[in-house]
Amino acid sequence: MKALRMVIRREWHRMTSRRLYLGVCVVLPLLCLFFMATIFGNGQMENIPVGIVDLDNTATSRNISRRISAAPTFRVTEHFTDEADARRALQQKDIYGYLVIPPRFEQKAVTGTGATLTYYYHYALLSVGSELMAAFENTLAPVALSPIVMQAEALGVSGEQIQTFLLPVEASTHPLYNPDMDYSIYLSQPFFFVLFQILILLTTVYSIGSELKFGSAGEWLEMARGNILTAVAGKLLPYTLIFSSIGILANYVLFGPLHIPFAGSLWLMNAVTVLFIIATQALAVFIYSVFPKIAYIISVVSMVGSLGATLSGVTFPVTAMYAPVHAASYLFPVRHFTEAAQAMIYFDAGFAYFWQSVATLFIFLLAALLILPLLKWWIKKEIREEAISASPSPCPPTALSTASVIRHEWHAIATNPAILLVLAGGIFLYGLLYNYMYAPNLVRKAPVAVVDLSHSALSREYIRLLYATPQTAVYGQTPNILEARQWMKQGDVAGILY
């Protein structure tokens, strides 16, 4: 216990003597928290710049333009006289979409001779494109039905009969757990911890690697009385306390001033957060123990942190990725923390619903403990090499030519797997891996539950259509809506058709 306290005091002195640690351990995480707390604004995509190409210039076309201007999603910034100018503005990102009202639109709409409204949107930006597509459809839907409504009213048909005729089956959509479709509710919390885990990985690797890099590993191990567990625990404990304090502060900020809905136990959320931080440190210890070269491993853990951001399942569902990528996602602590946190945030789930994720986080600690003897072997090897290099050489050093230095460095690069990994990963393989992760491109076979209380031919036809849709897969049918909600709470289904 005395050795542990001595290692902790030594590490605390190292931390307070260099401003680098203050910046990485305190300032950067707080900046990330401030950034994620403010980046999404009110949580809605509003006032997206769009344009209108009105080639009809009639009362009907002007009414459509007013509808577009009144929609909160749109901000009409330009009116164009031809489509070429609108397309050029879209390519330059001056606007993100535009509506084309063709010539003689009003005449065709009144006579029912195939009036068409065409809208274009920038779908390379997926979130913006999806928002614009939904907004265009919702805003222009009444316009598409207006000719039929006008003719029916002229024939004396009541408004209720028109509504029944146009929409015999009305869909009622209920976005559960985020009814306002608020981006901040869904993204602020996981994105902060995704950034946070990268800082934890880098700090942990640097704090251990600097001992070997600057030749103080022998002193560090000697102060721990040769016990590598005491040495690593004493070194990382100050960082664990600082990171845990920031993680708990982030939870209070996200679920307090930001008003992210959370009805679960904040104590349990804080406990899982601390466990996630320790598991991330354990992953960093494991990676560094495999190949303790700080210059290369810092690049490797940066890649690991970036991959964890994708494989956490926040930006694209991991279940929709290829099977090898899906399996690899479980090698990242942030994946399991995200699953546990989302179960508590969205479903108000108890520990029984995410105990597997918590148990997996403990496995990272076990892996780090098992590899500590290898880290100790590397440290002792470094100490022996330093002792040999410090002994006086009987032969005076010979001057090396420039060609000899170049050959030596080239041989080091060609024979060092860590350097090759960093170069290949950063330049080529890393990009291929990201393309492979997003290769499915579309979410397919998303599991849904069906609650059919009608048992009619029409309801069975709807279910057959659901089976035939490539984006969905019917997980099960039940007459009990509460059972379907339970499936969703357990993460077995992503939606319910009632």
Language model features: what each stretch is:
Residues 36, 57, 88, 241, ...:
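Membrane-spanning alpha-helical segments of multipass transporters and channels
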Residues 3, 21, 25, 235, ...:
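Residue-level signature of transmembrane alpha-helical entry/exit and packing/kink sites
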Residues 203-242:
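Helix-loop-helix units of permease transmembrane domains in multi-pass membrane transporters
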Residues 13-17, 193, 229-242, 246, ...:
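Alpha-helical transmembrane segments of multi-pass membrane proteins
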Residues 188-207:
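Long, hydrophobic alpha-helical segments
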Residues 24, 28, 197, 201, ...:
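Hydrophobic alpha-helical transmembrane segments of multipass membrane transporters and ion channels
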Residues 1-184, 391-498:
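Extracytoplasmic/periplasmic domains immediately adjacent to an N-terminal transmembrane anchor
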Residues 127-144, 177-192, 211-222, 243-251, ...:
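Hydrophobic alpha-helical transmembrane segments
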